[in-house]
C-alpha cells in the first residue's frame, strides 16, 4: 500500500516542474490562464459524457429486464436541446476567449513597462543559437541574460532551415525563418535560469539545440555580465568568423564575443532574401556575358 501511495504521489506531482505549467513571466502566466480556463470548459463536456456513457451502459444492458423497452422511440426534444445548446455555448465562449487572447498576447505587441526594453537579436544556426545585443555590441552562443521586470524585444531569423524559438517558462513560441524577421516580446517576473529550446525539427542535432536564459534581480548584475562578455578575446567582426561558427555542430558550448560586425543580423537575414538572389543572378549573368564577349 505504501509503495502504491508513493507511485501515485510521483505520478500526480510529475507535471509540477513542467515549464508550461510553472510560468515565470507575464506572457507565460496569461497563456497558463488560457490553458486552464479552456481545460475547465472542456470538462463541462467530457465529465457528463463519461458519466452518461457509464450510466446508460449499466441502465440499458441486456441483463437489466426491469427497464421499459421502446422499439419505436426515435425523438426527444429535451435531448436535442441539451446536446446542441450546451456545446454551442461552450464553443462560442472558447472562440471568444481564443480571439481576445490572440490579440492580447500578440508576440509583436510591445509590453508596457516603466523600464526600457532590452534588444536581443536571435539567429538559429545548426544546432545552436547566436544572440546579438546590438545596444552593447556583444554576442553570445547558447546563453542570454536580462534583468527581471524589464521587457525583452527579440528579433529572430534563421541561417539554416525553418526553426522555432521557445522559452516555455517565459511565454510564446515564435518561428525563425531564413530571409525573414519575426518579433517576440517577453518579460521575466522572477529571478532564475530558464531552459530555451528549438521547438521545430531542424535535423539530427535538433534535440540538443538548447540555450540558457538567465534573469537577474539587479541591472548592475546584468551590466557585470555584459562586461564579462566584452572582456572575451573572441570577436565576431567578420563574415568569415560567422561562417565558421555556422558550421553544423551538436552540443555546442556557451561562447562569448566581445564585439560584433555592424549590422550583422540584417546581413544574415538578407542572404536569403529574394532581392539578394535576384542581384546574385543578375551578377552571374553579367559575368557570363563578359566572359563570352572576351572569348569572342
UniProtKB/Swiss-Prot annotation:
Family statement: Belongs to the cytochrome c oxidase subunit 2 family.
Q: Give lipid-anchored residues (N-palmitoyl cysteine).
A: 16
Primary location recorded for the protein, binned into one broad class: membrane
Signal sequence residues? 1-15
Instruction: Spell out the Gene3D superfamilies in the cross-references.
Output: 1.10.287.90, Cupredoxins - blue copper proteins
Where does this protein come from, organism-wise?
Buchnera aphidicola subsp. Acyrthosiphon pisum (strain APS)
Q: Name a biological process GO annotation.
A: ATP synthesis coupled electron transport
Q: Summarize the subunit comment.
A: Heterooctamer of two A chains, two B chains, two C chains and two D chains.
Pfam families for this protein: COX2, COX_ARM
Q: Which SUPFAM superfamilies match?
A: Cupredoxins, Cytochrome c oxidase subunit II-like, transmembrane region
Extracellular-side stretches of the chain, per the record, are 16-33, 100-296
What ranges are annotated Cytoplasmic (topological domains)? 55-78
Q: Topology in the membrane?
A: Multi-pass membrane protein
According to the record, the segments passing through the membrane are 34-54, 79-99
Q: Where in the cell is it found?
A: Cell membrane
Q: Which GO terms describe its cellular component?
A: plasma membrane
Q: What does this protein do?
A: Cytochrome bo(3) ubiquinol terminal oxidase is the component of the aerobic respiratory chain of E.coli that predominates when cells are grown at high aeration. Has proton pump activity across the membrane in addition to electron transfer, pumping 2 protons/electron.
Residue positions of covalent lipid attachment, annotated as S-diacylglycerol cysteine: 16
Protein name (record): Cytochrome bo(3) ubiquinol oxidase subunit 2
**Keyword terms:** Cell membrane, Electron transport, Lipoprotein, Membrane, Oxidoreductase, Palmitate, Respiratory chain, Signal, Transmembrane, Transmembrane helix, Transport
Q: What would you give as a GO molecular function for this chain, any one?
A: cytochrome-c oxidase activity
Amino acid at each position: 500500500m505504501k509503495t502504491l501511495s508513493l507511485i501515485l504521489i510521483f505520478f500526480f506531482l510529475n507535471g509540477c516542474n513542467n515549464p508550461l505549467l510553472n510560468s515565470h513571466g507575464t506572457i507565460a502566466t496569461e497563456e497558463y490562464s488560457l490553458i486552464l480556463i479552456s481545460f475547465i470548459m472542456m470538462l463541462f463536456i467530457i465529465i457528463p459524457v463519461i458519466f452518461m456513457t457509464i450510466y446508460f451502459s449499466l441502465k440499458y444492458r441486456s441483463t437489466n429486464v426491469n427497464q421499459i423497452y421502446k422499439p419505436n422511440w426515435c425523438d426527444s426534444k429535451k435531448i436535442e436541446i441539451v446536446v446542441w445548446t450546451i456545446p454551442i455555448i461552450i464553443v462560442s465562449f472558447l472562440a471568444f476567449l481564443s480571439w481576445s487572447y490572440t490579440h492580447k498576447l500578440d508576440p509583436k505587441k510591445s509590453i508596457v513597462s516603466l523600464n526600457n526594453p532590452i534588444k536581443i537579436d536571435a539567429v538559429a544556426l545548426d544546432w545552436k543559437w547566436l544572440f546579438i545585443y546590438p545596444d552593447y555590441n556583444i554576442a553570445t552562443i547558447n546563453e542570454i541574460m536580462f534583468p527581471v521586470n524589464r521587457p525583452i524585444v527579440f528579433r529572430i531569423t534563421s541561417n539554416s532551415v525553418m526553426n522555432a524559438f521557445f522559452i516555455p517558462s517565459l511565454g510564446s513560441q515564435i518561428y525563425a525563418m531564413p530571409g525573414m524577421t519575426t518579433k517576440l516580446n517577453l518579460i521575466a517576473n522572477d529571478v532564475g535560469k530558464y531552459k530555451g529550446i528549438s521547438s521545430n525539427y531542424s535535423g539530427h542535432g535538433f534535440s540538443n539545440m538548447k540555450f540558457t536564459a538567465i534573469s537577474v534581480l539587479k541591472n548592475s548584475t546584468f551590466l557585470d555580465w555584459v562586461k564579462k562578455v566584452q572582456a572575451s578575446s573572441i570577436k565576431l567582426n567578420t563574415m568569415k568568423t560567422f561562417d565558421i561558427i555556422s558550421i553544423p555542430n551538436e552540443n555546442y558550448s556557451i561562447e562569448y564575443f566581445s564585439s560584433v560586425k555592424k549590422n550583422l543580423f540584417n546581413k544574415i537575414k538578407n542572404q536569403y532574401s529574394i532581392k539578394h538572389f535576384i542581384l546574385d543572378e543578375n551578377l552571374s549573368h553579367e559575368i557570363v556575358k563578359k566572359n563570352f564577349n572576351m572569348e569572342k
